[in-house]
């Protein structure tokens, strides 16, 4: 009995220690300053030579903080609100980073809001359709942010992804009402459920617009659950024509593995395959797993597991391990931000992205490789092929 009790105590102690370090990081992160709404107020400054100006369109279920404001808070709105922002990215910008202003925004070194305006639905659609960059149709890229994110953080992250990708697609942020608090995990779960129908509305709007070309929708963290649920709902309501036009990417999905399996069973195979970006050392997802009763999260699965490999092929999903990419955040949860600049933009280079199965993102040449190919390089001391 004593040995059994001692073993149980040791197990609890180990579990506590495994959680303690991430928990301390979370506490420290909570003490850090967060960007406020003042960053969204266009100042007297203009963009400078060498800066890049990007346009971000917004569809949101967040409340407006004032009747005449283009700033959004954490409360929920049943109706979509639309807006447009122009953001200047400094000439000194480093890939995947957001250069937050320290004091008065300076376009020489900071991200700066140049303009903002509210739109109605007709203006929103027309403005996006006009982002065709000389092509017959306008491509669209939709970003769905994750847990513990305020509006300005989501907006500037979308601007960073847009600028680093050098894509000419119209960039759209779907902003759901996150509490922007580390204690708001359950509230955020409710908020993504609250927003599901409105994301379906946005995707349907684009998917049935003949003046829209390709549609890429990328979810991050808890935003992946919202994205997957929206696609599932499109399937359940017979909107297969909309689904056929979507390219779905889930980055570090904070989704229970069993829940994801059920979602995928309804969604079915996509063409191109749904892409899932994972990293087994994601600290944020390890905390999520712990507080969810040790239920494994999709974004932290181990691609060397034969069961994972078989499941990916069977479900026609591309699982991409991005653990080789540098992590800019303490929680190793935002690696996907590096992908914007590294993903091939030439269609001829994107052939691997249409294959189902498990792959590792090889930073040498920005290509995909099987985990076994990379392992053989390590054992053999080889370089790039």
Predicted regions span which residues?
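Bacterial N-terminal signal peptides that target proteins for export
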Residues: 3-20
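C-terminal motif of bacterial Sec signal peptides marking the signal peptidase cleavage site
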Residues: 27-30
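Lipolytic serine-hydrolase domain surface
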Residues: 32, 36-115, 128-130, 134-135, ...
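Alpha/beta-hydrolase fold active-site loops
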Residues: 139
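The conserved beta1-alpha1 loop
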Residues: 142-146
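Short substrate-entry loop that stabilizes the transition state in hydrolases
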Residues: 150-153
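Gly/Ala-rich beta-loop-alpha elbow adjacent to hydrolase catalytic centers
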Residues: 219, 223, 227
């Amino acid at each position: 009995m004593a040995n059994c009790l001692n073993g149980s105590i040791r197990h609890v102690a180990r579990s506590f220690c495994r959680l303690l370090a991430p928990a301390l990081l979370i506490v420290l992160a909570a003490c850090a300053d967060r960007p406020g709404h003042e960053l969204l107020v266009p100042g007297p400054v203009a963009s400078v030579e060498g800066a890049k100006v990007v346009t971000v369109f917004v569809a949101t279920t967040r409340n407006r903080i004032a009747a005449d404001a283009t700033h959004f808070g954490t409360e929920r709105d049943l109706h979509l609100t639309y807006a447009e922002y122009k953001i200047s990215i400094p000439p000194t910008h480093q890939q995947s980073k957001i250069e937050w202003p320290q004091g008065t925004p300076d376009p020489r070194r900071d991200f700066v809001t140049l303009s903002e305006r509210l739109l109605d639905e007709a203006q929103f659609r027309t403005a996006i359709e006009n982002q065709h960059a000389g092509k017959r149709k306008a491509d669209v890229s939709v970003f769905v942010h994750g847990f513990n994110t305020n509006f300005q953080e989501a907006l500037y992250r979308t601007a960073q992804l847009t600028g680093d990708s050098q894509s000419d697609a119209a960039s759209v942020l779907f902003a759901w009402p996150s509490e922007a608090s580390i204690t708001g995990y359950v509230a955020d779960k409710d908020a993504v459920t609250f927003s599901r129908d409105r994301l379906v509305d946005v995707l349907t709007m684009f998917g049935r617009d003949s003046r829209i070309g390709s549609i890429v929708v990328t979810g991050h963290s808890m935003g992946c659950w919202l994205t997957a649920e929206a696609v599932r709902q499109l399937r359940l309501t017979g909107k297969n024509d909309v689904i056929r036009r979507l390219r779905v990417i889930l980055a570090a999905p904070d989704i229970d593995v069993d829940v994801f399996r059920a979602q995928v069973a309804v969604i079915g195979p996509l063409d191109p395959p749904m892409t899932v970006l994972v990293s087994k050392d994601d600290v944020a997802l390890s905390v999520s797993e712990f507080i969810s009763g040790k239920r494994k999260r999709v974004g932290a699965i181990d691609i060397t597991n034969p069961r994972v490999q078989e499941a990916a092929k069977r479900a026609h999903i591309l699982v991409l391990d991005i653990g080789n990419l540098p992590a800019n955040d303490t929680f190793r949860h935002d690696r996907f931000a590096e992908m914007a600049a590294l993903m091939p933009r030439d269609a001829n280079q994107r052939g691997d992205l249409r294959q189902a199965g498990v792959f590792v993102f090889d930073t040498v040449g920005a290509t995909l490789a099987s985990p076994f190919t990379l392992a053989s390089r390590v054992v053999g001391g080889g370089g790039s092929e």
